[in-house]
Amino acid sequence: MHENMFFARTQQLSILEKRIRDLKDGYRQNIAIVGDEHVGKTSIIFKFLQQFCDNRIIPVYIEVRNETLACLCKRFIAVLLYNFLLNSEMPLKEDLEFLITKSSFYIPQTIEKIKALLHTLSKKKKDSVFTELLSLAESIHDETGKHCVIIFDEFHNLETTGVKKIFTEWAKILIVQKSTLYIIISSLKHKARGILSKDLSLLFGNFEIITIEPFDIKTSQDYLTSSLQSVTIHDALKNFIVNFTGGCPLYLTVISEMLTRSPQVSLVNILEELLFDSSGLLFQNFSNYVNRFQGSASKNEQLAILFMIADGHNKIKDIAHLLRKTKKELSSSINALLESDTITQSGDFLKTTDRVLGFWLKFVYQERLNSLTFDAKNQKALFRLKIDSLIQEFIATTKRPVSERMMELLHLFQDDQIQIERKKLRLNHFREVKFVEFKNCNLTDGLLCRSEDSIWVIAFKYDALTEEDIGEFAKECKKFRHKLQQKIIITFQDVDANSRLKALQEKIWTWDINNVNHVLDLFSKQRITVAQTALSAEPLRI
């Protein structure tokens, strides 16, 4: 983990701090932090623990691994006792027997329970061991008045300990434990939400879910500005990095660190080292990831689907056609990819969760598979050419007006269905898309789209959207006198609550830049970046 990877996330830290204060005041609200790999979930916890200081709270951070119950219990007890003794001013050792001996002077009853638990483990018994382990936190509270904050990182791995119905057992403890706060973390969003909605869905002791997303465009740009202060780099290349990484903190960090270490090295060279060279950090990471999909016919089918999506064939019906199978025959493999959070689904479309993985699959992994001789020199030159072409295409695209790019996108719609913020939307096949001007409205320019049975009216708002804007746009839409309308305002700034409510009342969609980029992703088009209208003028060195 990179120390400087932590950036922003102040809202999430504030929630954690508030929940700690609430715990001391007698109100316990457990927390579940979920998000894709590499988005910085653990870094939020580490930052919180780093700045946390309260003698009345004992933090217990446990990274849950694929290990036996005995190993988990011993690590848990060691961390619990070590952090309990941390403020005692005595020299400490990471030795379980030492920690038990020293703690026995302060919490004798808890130590007796620990010894009994370890004895049970030595007999290779598992019944009730996990619940006894978690009850140690309440025992310490009874003896000292101190609260424990137990953090299970990748908590879904608790299933590998061999305890039957471990989450059901845990739920029973959660109901009665009032003095212990649990924070659980998971990179498997689909699986975690399943556990939370089923086994850990409780009236008392339930979990507040905090979803960690990649950085948005502005935060990504702010991160690069902060981390590349000593590097002279064109704004267009910064925006390309934001687009390429999808705002993933790990990728932003790795690329910015390499640019800082070697400011004279081009971005193409850096991406080549990371993604193409066999010793590259991301090459090895993605190679290990792809190895999960080898060894059986079903795994091979999942990998074939992943290749299709990375290559731009991301409609389910198109994948079925190319693989010569029915959608029903592919459903189990698609569901497996969805459940592992390798891909996401939006209506009739699929896309890779990790943008950089998708690029690597298309331009590195598949190229190596399809090469008859694998001429390393030729493959490297081809890779560099594709990276360079991708950068040039991005820069050229971002210079075009947003309205023009949206018109191009709308012409690609073919009556497929997508999902935007949990709402389904049919992408009508338009026979006509044209520019319009709203003369009596602050939303001066827009698009009018006609299909066989409906019209879409789209307006663009480049500064803050107001309730007045929405009211005027609603009046403009009425001029078209068509019953079946989709009214959409595309805005490039945050929409305040009042404006959003007004839009709901007028049945107007408000799409922010994330919504638009979501649709662009589904059609393999370059994303829109906030700073695209203000690119710097220094010479561009790729």
Could you tell me what each predicted segment is?
Residues 353, 360, 366-542:
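Mixed-charge (Asp/Glu-Lys/Arg
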Residues 338-348:
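A short, conserved structural fragment
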Residues 28-149, 158, 180:
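P-loop NTPase nucleotide-binding core
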Residues 208-237, 243-244, 255:
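Conserved small helical "lid"/interfacial subdomain of P-loop NTPases
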Residues 323-340:
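Short amphipathic alpha-helical interaction segments
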Residues 253-327, 374-375, 379-382:
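Winged-helix-like regulatory helical subdomains adjacent to P-loop NTPase cores
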Residues 196-214:
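A short helix-turn-beta junction within AAA+ P-loop NTPase domains corresponding to the substrate/partner-engaging
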Residues 34-35, 142-151, 157-162, 170-199:
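Sensor-1/coupling segment of RecA-like P-loop NTPase cores
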